[in-house]
């Protein structure tokens, strides 16, 4: 299957793609550039806005704009005509170490926002990462962690019925994807178990998406692949993209049947074998995805 380049974005770390059904547009972030991007297929128009600090993940906000996991916590971001993102502080995250930030995040099927944190020096392997839940607590109170002892939490996803939560850790020392039983009523994950040992497959587990049949799609960082695992953890197929570091994927397009893939453009390395690194790509895998849930807060 051919991966189509939709935008030669040259993102340092392109992450958190979210399809806006209302706008028929793809949004995503470039973490180190502190930018939110938008691309509309209808007219091939691209636009971006600058944030006040690194932003790592986004979910649609009910008041318009975006709920974003950033360096210091969670913010409500609203794109402005001046090319900047107006930010309203929602919640602090008291990181375990300096130089940490949010990483992967998304809403469950009921609109609760889950987000992980990591140390910015990934190579150090600090097990200081945590997983947090935000349901709109008032007053900007610091979030309390639900899970700790993580290095690079990633791969958050929820089954179509909302009763299974997925989480991965991308660090080379871990490379695991876990599944949890998840109660849609109270939003509490339990019964953590190994879903996929990614050391048995090419690439490290990065960002993910779930299709309407329950297939779990995850970007295989360093391998230039996007894997689909069936709900029982079996590898169903692997699709190639023309870059080594696909970062996250999301279903979009008019029928939610296009799998968009963001990627990473490494610094200080020869990119002659992957000149499109940091681009956004489209795959048509023959399955449909699910619309991302709006934050309920």
Region annotations inferred by a language model:
Residues 9-23, 52-69, 96-112, 147-164, ...:
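Beta-rich, blade/repeat-based domains predominating
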Residues 78-83, 137-138, 179-188, 285-290:
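Short loop/turn segments immediately following beta-strands, especially the blade-tip
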Residues 84-146:
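Hydrophobic alpha-helical segments and helix pairs
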Residues 2-8, 44-50, 88-95, 141-148, ...:
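A short beta-strand motif characteristic of beta-propeller blades
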Residues 79-81, 132-140, 227-237, 253, ...:
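Flexible "stalk/tail and boundary" regions
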Residues 252-297:
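Blade-level signature of beta-propeller repeat domains, shared across WD40, Kelch, NHL, RCC1
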Residues 20-21, 26-31, 67-72, 113-125, ...:
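Conserved beta-strand positions in repeat-built beta-propeller and related beta-rich domains
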Residues 35-37, 73, 129-132, 176-178, ...:
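A short loop-to-beta-strand structural motif that recurs across blades of beta-propeller domains
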């Amino acid at each position: 299957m051919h991966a189509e380049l939709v935008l030669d974005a040259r993102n340092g770390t392109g992450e958190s793609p979210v399809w806006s059904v209302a706008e028929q547009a793809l949004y995503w972030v470039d973490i180190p550039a502190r930018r939110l991007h938008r691309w509309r297929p209808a007219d091939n128009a691209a636009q971006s806005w600058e944030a006040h600090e690194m932003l790592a993940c986004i979910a649609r906000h009910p008041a318009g704009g975006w709920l974003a996991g950033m360096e210091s916590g969670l913010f409500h971001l609203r794109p402005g005509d001046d090319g900047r993102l107006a930010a309203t502080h929602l919640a602090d995250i008291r990181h375990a170490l300096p130089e940490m930030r949010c990483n992967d995040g998304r809403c469950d099927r009921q609109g609760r926002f889950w987000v992980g944190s990591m140390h910015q020096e990934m190579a150090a392997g600090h097990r200081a990462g945590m997983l947090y839940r935000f349901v709109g607590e008032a007053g900007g109170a610091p979030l309390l962690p639900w899970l700790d002892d993580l290095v690079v939490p990633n791969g958050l996803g929820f089954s179509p019925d909302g009763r299974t939560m997925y989480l991965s850790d991308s660090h080379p020392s871990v490379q695991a994807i876990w599944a949890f039983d998840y109660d849609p009523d109270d939003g509490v994950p339990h019964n953590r178990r190994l879903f996929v040992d990614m050391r048995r497959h090419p690439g490290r587990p990065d960002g993910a998406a779930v299709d309407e049949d329950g297939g779990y799609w995850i970007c295989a960082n360093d391998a230039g692949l996007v894997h689909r695992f069936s709900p029982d953890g079996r590898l169903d197929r692997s699709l190639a993209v023309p870059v080594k570091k696909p970062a996250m994927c999301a279903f979009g397009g008019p029928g939610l049947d296009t799998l968009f893939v963001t990627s990473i453009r490494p610094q200080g390395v020869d990119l002659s074998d992957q000149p499109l690194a940091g681009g956004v790509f489209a795959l048509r895998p023959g399955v449909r995805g699910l619309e991302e849930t709006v934050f309920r807060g």
